């Protein structure tokens, strides 16, 4: 007989369980040795009767001190080799006891690495994991919430009632619970009770799958159950630096590339129709494509265009389509809008089979305030700074990560490793880096806090970015890490051991703004703005630059690329072709946004798909043909990519002909006599005999002309090429006398034989 003091303690603990205020349920629940006998205590809210099955015998569990706390006496130590039989409302079922699993899931070494911020595979411990332990199948849950008073697992398994399954608090603010009755596909959340008594229902920060919006629960999902076939791709990728290869990127948004009619159902592997995910109210009767459908339609399209990589705007789970994916709540989960994690793995796998790399937009700079997300996670500012002057982007309505906290950095750095390791991606583009680097970013005076040295640099964010890139290249030496950094912060693409941020590419925002400003000017006035088209070369070799015409430039009233151009339709098409061709010949890797490859007219709208009907018209097919041929030429001519980051690879012939708005230059390959001559005419004037100097006499084949009829141009040019003439110009003794078509860029290559 248990003594009175013991009975009072048990009653007190049971009341705490009922009120969801118990952080140590193992202290009372599960197997215990009391007064020379083994006792099983189980907590079963609203149960009518409970029995314990052990070694082919059944032992009745009596309700003790509380109507939902049951106790059975067994003849020996049962360990976890018993089951509980529960009768509730006339329904009886048998299950293993959640509190029979008493061992720590996250061991001392794991906790130590996590607390240091150096557990690069923390997702293998945190979150929901399908495991088999001691012949028990179930799900192990593990979460970090050091300030919580209590946490429970809620879901379909317990009617979303937090009184059923309280978690056990471990050292380091870690909470754990093994749920033997749960399985793959079960929905769940964490019910977190704060020290102040408030209750939050949170999705799993480490969840591998979440519900389709507008629902926001997490879903138990297997992690390592996909058979990859891209080992040769990965081996080749990591054997050498990728930035010394041609890189031509198709940036796109999976949800607005192409829609499908809701009448056309998607059938899964079992032939069953999948519930459609509506595209948007703006276009009723349409649905989003699934990952398998995108695999069949998008990958062949990108391959046909000749791009080397696809860049996907954020696919981490996010609740609001209108955020374009940049307000993430499910960092470890591909969005379920398009399907399952394994279906996305198959998408990546197929990309690699077709020779296409996959880049993901990654958003470590901020996160939304959605109640089910990271904000105020355990009743305190856990992931974000407590002071809004450093912890909030008021203009964006989002919160900023507390990069000074080891566990927060670990969450993000491990997330980076996760996408490369678990989904075999090839690169990331880090969004809004400038917003991370500066404490006063988009903040008026008085609404930001200087750093310890009195400056505006965010020292903690700098260290985080350096750590993230260092760890990334340590694990994946062939990765691409691209910074969207819009200021003149130094050494963005220099290694971390040199004091740099450690990226290997940076979007050239200056080039983008200068070129768009220049091309929006009426061609007759471009002579007064020649510097806009030439200035980028003066700083081109300070960083490893990527030229990007991105999604940001075709929204919010900015017009799509074609409609930025002045003049009538003929001039718009010609200007677009000239800009794209100049971009492909300018030093730097390439990125364009979807729709630019065929001259989309309308601004990008996340709620709609692209204007594919425009391809019925020749000028739009011409722009698409131009991109196809530019990508083919680009990959076949090393002079266009091999020395992107070496001044040897570029040389002006003439950049001073302002009155004609003509520029000419050479692109050179290293250690060879291979070079290309590029001449751009940025006015509608046709020049019949325009002379430029060249270093070697002979025949120069015209290998590309943006004014060609295949591209919708007037087909003016140089009849396949030109022989040099003996004429001293531009410090050369040989010259080419060329026909320059209107609003065009022409490319010539010296031939050893005509």
UniProtKB/Swiss-Prot annotation:
Q: Gene Ontology cellular component?
A: cytosol
User: Where are the coiled-coil regions?
Assistant: none
Q: Which InterPro entries match?
A: A-amylase/branching_C (IPR006048), Branching_enzy (IPR037439), GlgB (IPR006407), GlgB_N (IPR054169), GlgB_N_E_set_prok (IPR044143), Glyco_hydro_13_cat_dom (IPR006047), Glyco_hydro_13_N (IPR004193), Glyco_hydro_b (IPR013780)
Per UniProt, the enzyme's principal EC class comes to transferase
Q: Which GO terms describe its biological process?
A: glycogen biosynthetic process
Q: Which Pfam families match?
A: Alpha-amylase, Alpha-amylase_C, CBM_48, GlgB_N
Give the E.C. number(s).
2.4.1.18
The record's listing under SMART domains reads: Aamy
| Claim: Nuclease is one of the keywords in the record | no
Q: Which residues form the active site?
A: 431, 484
- State the Gene Ontology terms under molecular function: 1,4-alpha-glucan branching enzyme activity; cation binding; hydrolase activity, hydrolyzing O-glycosyl compounds
Subunit composition and interactions: Monomer.
Instruction: State its role.
Output: Catalyzes the formation of the alpha-1,6-glucosidic linkages in glycogen by scission of a 1,4-alpha-linked oligosaccharide from growing alpha-1,4-glucan chains and the subsequent attachment of the oligosaccharide to the alpha-1,6 position.
Family of this protein: Belongs to the glycosyl hydrolase 13 family. GlgB subfamily.
Spell out the PANTHER family in the cross-references: 1,4-ALPHA-GLUCAN-BRANCHING ENZYME (PTHR43651:SF3)
User: What is the name attached to this protein's record?
Assistant: 1,4-alpha-glucan branching enzyme GlgB
């Amino acid at each position: 007989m248990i003594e009175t003091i013991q009975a009072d303690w048990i009653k007190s603990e049971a009341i705490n369980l009922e009120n969801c205020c118990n952080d140590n349920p193992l202290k009372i629940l599960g197997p215990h040795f009391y007064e020379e006998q083994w006792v099983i205590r189980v907590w079963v809210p609203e149960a009518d009767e409970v029995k314990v099955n052990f070694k082919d015998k059944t032992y009745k569990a009596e309700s003790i001190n509380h109507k939902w706390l049951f106790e059975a006496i067994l003849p020996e130590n049962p360990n976890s080799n018993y089951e509980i039989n529960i009768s509730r409302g006339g329904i009886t079922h048998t299950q293993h006891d959640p509190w029979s699993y008493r061992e720590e899931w996250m061991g001392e070494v794991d906790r130590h690495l996590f607390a240091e911020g150096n557990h690069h595979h923390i997702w293998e411990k945190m979150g929901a994991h399908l495991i088999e332990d001691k012949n028990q199948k179930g799900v192990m849950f593990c979460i970090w919430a050091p300030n919580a008073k209590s946490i429970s697992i809620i879901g379909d398994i317990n009617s979303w009632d937090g009184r059923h399954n309280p978690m056990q608090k471990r050292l380091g603010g870690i909470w754990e619970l093994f749920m033997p009755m749960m399985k793959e596909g079960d929905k769940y959340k964490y019910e977190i009770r704060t020290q102040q008594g408030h209750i939050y229902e949170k999705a799993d920060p480490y969840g591998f799958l979440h519900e389709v919006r507008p629902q926001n629960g997490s879903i138990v999902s297997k992690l390592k159950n996909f058979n990859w076939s891209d080992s040769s791709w990965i081996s080749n990728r990591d054997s050498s630096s990728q930035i010394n290869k041609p890189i031509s990127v198709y940036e796109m948004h999976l949800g607005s590339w192409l829609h499908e009619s809701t009448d056309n159902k998607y059938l899964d592997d079992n032939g069953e129709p999948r519930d459609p995910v509506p595209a948007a109210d703006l276009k009723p009767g349409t649905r989003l494509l699934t990952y398998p459908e995108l695999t069949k339609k998008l990958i062949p399209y990108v391959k046909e265009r000749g791009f080397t990589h696809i860049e996907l705007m954020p696919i981490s789970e996010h609740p609001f389509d209108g955020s374009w994916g940049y307000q993430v709540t499910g960092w470890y989960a591909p969005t379920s809008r398009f399907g399952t994690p394994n279906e996305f793995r198959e998408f990546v796998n197929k990309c690699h089979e077709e020779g296409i790399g996959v880049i993901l937009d990654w958003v470590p700079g901020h996160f939304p305030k959605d109640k089910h997300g990271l904000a105020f996670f355990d009743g305190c500012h856990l992931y974000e700074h407590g002071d809004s002057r450093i912890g909030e982007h008021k203009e964006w309505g989002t919160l900023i990560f507390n990069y000074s906290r080891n566990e927060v950095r670990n969450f993000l750095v491990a997330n980076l490793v996760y996408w490369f390791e678990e989904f075999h991606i090839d690169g990331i583009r880090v969004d809004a880096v400038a917003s991370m680097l500066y404490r006063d970013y988009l903040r008026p005076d008085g609404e930001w806090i200087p750093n310890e040295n009195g400056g505006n640099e965010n020292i903690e964010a700098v260290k985080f970015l350096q750590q993230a890139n260092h760890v990334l290249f340590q694990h994946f030496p062939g990765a691409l890490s691209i910074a969207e950094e819009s200021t003149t912060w130094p050494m963005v693409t220099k290694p971390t051991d040199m004091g740099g941020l450690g990226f290997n590419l940076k979007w050239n925002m200056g080039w983008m703004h200068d070129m768009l400003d220049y091309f929006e000017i009426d061609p007759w006035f471009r002579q007064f703005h020649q510097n806009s088209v030439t200035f980028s070369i003066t700083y081109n070799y300070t960083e490893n630059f990527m030229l990007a015409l991105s999604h940001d430039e075709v929204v919010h009233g900015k017009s799509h690329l074609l409609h930025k151009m002045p003049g009538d339709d003929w001039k718009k098409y010609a200007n677009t072709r000239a800009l794209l061709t100049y971009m492909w010949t300018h030093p730097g890797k390439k990125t364009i946004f979807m729709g630019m490859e065929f001259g989309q007219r309308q601004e990008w709208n996340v709620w709609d798909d692209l204007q594919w009907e425009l391809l019925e018209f020749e000028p739009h097919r011409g722009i698409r043909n131009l991109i196809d041929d530019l990508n083919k030429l680009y990959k076949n001519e090393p002079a266009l990519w091999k020395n992107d980051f070496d001044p040897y690879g570029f040389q002006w012939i003439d950049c001073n002909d302002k009155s004609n708005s003509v520029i000419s230059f050479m692109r050179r390959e290293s250690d060879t006599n291979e070079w290309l001559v590029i001449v751009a005419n940025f006015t509608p004037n046709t020049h019949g005999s325009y002379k430029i100097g060249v270093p070697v006499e002979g025949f120069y084949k015209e290998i590309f002309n943006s004014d060609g009829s295949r591209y919708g141009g007037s087909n003016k040019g140089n009849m396949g090429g030109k022989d040099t003439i003996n004429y001293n110009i531009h410090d050369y003794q040989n010259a080419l006398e060329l026909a320059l078509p209107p609003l065009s860029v022409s490319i010539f290559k010296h031939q050893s034989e005509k």
